[in-house]
Each structure stands twice: as structure tokens, then as C-alpha cells.
């Protein structure tokens, strides 16, 4: 996965996700929308087969890089928890 920052301000971030589709972006969007620091978390892919999606994050005056990093860490923790539970269940 390649990421390209298209825009970065004090409270807004636009990132192009090269080669990604809905699965990861929906998960990231859902996690970000649970954060009270987030005003907008959305993405758009004009032509899903040909275009790379662009993710937009707007915060309440907080550095969007910190917010997206925190959300990514929560997602990683959730995946770790799932893996532990799964391994325990299939023993």
C-alpha cells in the first residue's frame, strides 16, 4: 500500500490510498467517526476500478496525523484481540 498526502493543514488531511479499496477505508472511517475530535471522516473513489480512493479527515483543531495514528493503533489492538480470541477458540 502506498499513501500520498494530498493536503495537510492544522485540522485537515487528505490522503490518496494507492491500490486500496473499501475494506480498509471503511474500517478506518468507522473508527475515526467514533472519535469526538473528528468532524469529518470520509473517502471517495470516482471510478473504483481505475482511481485510487482519497480519504478526507477534518478534526476539531487537533493535528489530523495524531488522530489517524490513534485510530490506526486502536484498529491494530482490536485485530490483536481478535487473533488471541480466535487462537483460544480453535485450540
UniProtKB/Swiss-Prot annotation:
Taxonomy, superkingdom: Archaea
Biological-process GO terms, alphabetical: DNA-templated transcription
Record's GO cellular component terms: cytoplasm; DNA-directed RNA polymerase complex
GO MF assignments: DNA-directed RNA polymerase activity; protein dimerization activity
The keyword Nucleotidyltransferase is annotated on this UniProt entry: yes
Catalytic reaction list: RNA(n) + a ribonucleoside 5'-triphosphate = RNA(n+1) + diphosphate
Short name of one Pfam family: RNA_pol_L_2
EC number: 2.7.7.6
InterPro entries: RBP11-like, RBP11-like_dimer, Rpo11-like
Main location: cytoplasm
Keywords tagged on the record: Cytoplasm, DNA-directed RNA polymerase, Nucleotidyltransferase, Transcription, Transferase
Signal peptide coordinates: none
Subcellular compartments: Cytoplasm
Record-stated family: Belongs to the archaeal Rpo11/eukaryotic RPB11/RPC19 RNA polymerase subunit family.
NCBIfam families listed in its UniProt record: PRK01146.2-1
Subunit details: Part of the RNA polymerase complex.
Entry function: DNA-dependent RNA polymerase (RNAP) catalyzes the transcription of DNA into RNA using the four ribonucleoside triphosphates as substrates.
Name recorded for this polypeptide: DNA-directed RNA polymerase subunit Rpo11
Organism for this UniProt entry: Methanothrix thermoacetophila (strain DSM 6194 / JCM 14653 / NBRC 101360 / PT)
Amino acid at each position: 500500500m502506498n499513501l500520498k498526502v494530498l493536503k495537510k493543514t492544522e485540522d485537515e488531511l487528505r490522503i490518496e490510498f494507492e491500490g486500496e479499496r473499501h475494506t480498509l477505508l471503511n474500517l478506518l472511517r468507522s473508527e475515526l467517526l467514533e472519535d469526538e475530535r473528528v468532524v469529518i471522516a470520509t473517502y471517495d473513489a470516482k471510478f473504483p476500478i481505475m482511481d485510487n480512493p482519497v480519504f478526507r479527515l477534518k478534526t476539531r483543531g487537533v493535528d489530523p496525523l495524531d488522530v489517524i495514528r490513534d485510530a490506526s493503533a486502536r484498529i491494530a489492538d482490536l485485530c490483536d484481540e481478535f487473533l488471541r480470541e480466535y487462537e483460544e477458540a480453535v485450540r
